[in-house]
Design a protein with these regions (language model features):
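A mid-sequence, solvent-exposed acidic-amphipathic segment
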Residues: 209-210, 217-237, 241-242, 247
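Active-site/acyl-donor-binding loops of N-acyltransferases
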Residues: 143-162, 234-236, 286-335
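Acyl-donor-binding surface of acyltransferase catalytic domains
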Residues: 1-12, 82, 98-105, 110-187, ...
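Conserved donor-binding loop and adjoining core beta-sheet/short helix segment
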Residues: 21-24, 28-132, 240-268
């Protein structure tokens, strides 16, 4: 991801070093200034970092320091993508504090990251930003990054939602029931393995830039049940007998207590077209409404017509799209 990166108008001398845990407050502040509508917290960021499987995948973060007082003024990350894994493919992220932009700091961080990745034999780079970030988009394009994919962000006013208008969509087909992950964990603590298998199967059908790859169960499990964002009572699962056939889950935000985020909604191929996805989404909306949440936010590929259709029908309002950018390093100068 790239956040508010601009080309320099004056040079600034900064020190670049490896990230240390005491840098969390500074990088969270920088990230929240870059994307204030999607703020994170130190706890959330630390959880993401600590649950990333560094035995299987490469992960590294740098910070840029103002040399006179060691203030963190920028950051850069790179890592393998566990759910779209290729040993030569990496996600990259850059952000510079607003007061320190246009001084060449982003360029210094970029050069450091690309140099590292070239030494690791990287050939593909991936990063993301919102279409409103015109400076970041221009910055990426000037460095050879091209647009690969677009995803709508959409938002639903949960409190204004008229559940009565969807009464006919609440009912389930014969033989299908909906339970929560909390209920399933109480019934069988080992249920996560079956849920993971379904999640991986459903992910194969989601439009994406790079082919889906199966990441570690352990990472997925931590995200589902131990993340600061986890809500097992808002993780809805459709069952046909004892078999899982669909899901739709919500996650919370520590900074935005009245906002919930849709994680993933999907139904197995042989059960599609029967209203199960809509019924799952309605349970999620009902949860948000009954818990006093103001808004639900979600993201969908612009190519995912079926899910976009459901969201439009429910009343989700499209926001500016998020763009995936990529760069091929195969012919990049390695000198």
């Amino acid at each position: 991801m790239a956040g508010f990166i601009q080309d320099k108008v004056q040079q600034s001398h900064v020190e670049i070093r490896d990230f240390e845990p005491e840098d969390y407050p500074a990088i969270v502040e920088i990230e929240n200034l870059a994307y204030p509508e999607h703020p994170t917290t130190v706890e959330e960021r630390r959880f993401e970092d600590e649950t990333f499987d560094r035995k299987r995948y490469v992960w590294r973060r740098y910070v840029a320091l103002e040399p006179s007082n060691d203030t963190v003024v920028g950051e850069a990350d790179y890592n393998h993508l566990p759910w779209a894994y290729d040993p030569a493919r990496f996600g990259i992220w850059f952000a510079v504090h607003p007061q320190w932009r246009r001084r060449g700091i982003g360029s210094r961080l970029y050069e450091k990251v690309v140099g590292d990745l070239q030494s690791r034999g990287a050939t593909q780079l991936r990063t993301w930003t919102q279409e409103t970030q015109s400076d970041a988009i221009g910055w990426l394009r000037r460095r050879g990054h091209g647009e690969l994919h677009r995803a709508w962000e959409s938002r639903l006013d949960a409190q204004a939602f008229d559940m009565g208008a969807f009464r006919g969509h609440w009912d389930l087909p014969a033989g299908i029931k909906i339970v929560t992950l909390a209920e399933e964990l109480a019934r069988d603590p080992e249920c996560l393995k079956e849920l993971f298998e379904m999640d991986c199967e459903l992910a194969l059908d989601v439009p994406r830039v790079d082919p889906f790859t199966r990441g570690p169960f352990e990472m997925w499990r931590e995200w589902v049940i131990n993340s600061p964002r986890s809500l097992p009572d808002a993780f809805f699962i459709a069952k046909a007998g004892d078999r899982y056939v669909g899901q739709s889950d919500l996650g919370s935000s520590e900074q935005l207590s009245d906002v919930l985020y849709t994680g993933f909604t999907g139904v197995r191929r042989e059960y599609r077209g029967r209203g199960i996805a809509m019924a799952l989404k309605l349970r999620a909306v009902d949860y948000a409404k009954s818990h006093g949440c103001r808004e639900i936010r979600t993201w969908n590929s612009t190519l995912n017509a079926p899910m976009l259709g459901i969201n439009v029908k429910l009343g989700f309002v499209k926001q500016p799209v998020w763009i995936t950018f990529g760069k091929d390093l195969t012919h990049e100068d390695r000198s």
